Each structure stands twice: as structure tokens, then as C-alpha cells.
Curated annotation (Swiss-Prot):
Assigned keywords, A-Z: Membrane, Signal, Transmembrane, Transmembrane helix
Organism annotation: Homo sapiens (Human)
Bilayer topology: Single-pass type I membrane protein
Protein name: Transmembrane protein 207
Compartments, record wording: Membrane
Transmembrane parts of this sequence: 52-72
A Gene Ontology term for the protein's cellular component: membrane
Gene for this chain: TMEM207
Quaternary structure, from the entry: Interacts with WWOX.
Signal peptide, first to last residue: 1-29
Length: 146
């Protein structure tokens, strides 16, 4: 745990303790008696404040569970991905007057492109595969053929 996070946790615990101190004093103290009333010693009776202690215990357990879940979630999200596979991506550029250029790169999803090699004739592709390298046919001819 980092030093600032540890300081934050201890600060939160001390703040909760300071806020709960008046509640503890209220439960454990005797109520003052007035002159006209009969004074009852509350230490002799069973206190009816047991539900406050159970409620306080439940809140403490819930806070600890939430903290543990958040910590586990952070650790799970920050772990390195071992199952990420490297892929190869190829990009071809074809121009009217230029020959076909190929670029191959090894790509990892988490890191990005690792290795780039650019060679002009890396992938020899026959020219008839692409057809004539002229201007595209007009729209009317495409509509007639379909």
C-alpha cells in the first residue's frame, strides 16, 4: 500500500471514531435526574441500546467488505493481460503510376505497433487482379451492369 493511501485509511478510521464518540457517550452514560422525577439507576437495568452496537458492528463489517471489494477490483483491472496475442497487420498502397507497396507490422492490442518493415515489393500481386489502373467507370455503366 502506498504511503498516501495508508494515511487516507487511517484518517478515515479516526474520523469515524470521532463521529461515533458522542454515540458511545450517550449509550454508556447515566441520564441526569430532575428534581421532581424519580431517579433510576440505569446501570442496574439491562440497557436497551444493544441494537445500536449491532448496527455499529454491521456498518463496520459493510465498510470493510466494500473496501476489500474495491481493492480486489483495482488489482484485477491493473493486472497484465497474459492472454493477449500478437497479430500481424498488412497495409497495401496502390497508386496509378506507382507499384504496389506493402507494409507489415506486428500489432499487440495492449501496446500497439511493435515492428514496422516497409518494402516496395514485399507482396507481389499480379496486376490483372486489380484490373486496369485507370479511372473508375462512370456511374451509368455500373448501373447497366447490375
Amino acid at each position: 500500500m502506498s504511503r498516501s493511501r495508508l494515511f487516507s485509511v487511517t484518517s478515515a478510521i479516526s474520523t469515524i471514531g470521532i463521529l461515533c464518540l458522542p454515540l458511545f457517550q450517550l449509550v454508556l452514560s447515566d441520564l441526569p435526574c430532575e428534581e421532581d422525577e424519580m431517579c433510576v439507576n440505569y446501570n442496574d437495568q439491562h440497557p436497551n441500546g444493544w441494537y445500536i452496537w449491532i448496527l455499529l458492528l454491521l456498518v463496520l463489517v459493510a465498510a470493510l467488505l466494500c473496501g476489500a471489494v474495491v481493492l480486489c477490483l483495482q488489482c484485477w483491472l491493473r493486472r497484465p493481460r497474459i492472454d493477449s496475442h500478437r497479430r500481424t497487420m498488412a497495409v497495401f498502397a496502390v497508386g496509378d503510376l506507382d507499384s504496389i507497396y506493402g507494409t507489415e507490422a506486428a500489432v499487440s492490442p495492449t501496446v500497439g505497433i511493435h515492428l514496422q518493415t516497409q518494402t516496395p515489393d514485399l507482396y507481389p500481386v499480379p496486376a490483372p487482379c486489380f484490373g486496369p489502373l485507370g479511372s473508375p467507370p462512370p456511374y451509368e455503366e455500373i448501373v447497366k451492369t447490375t
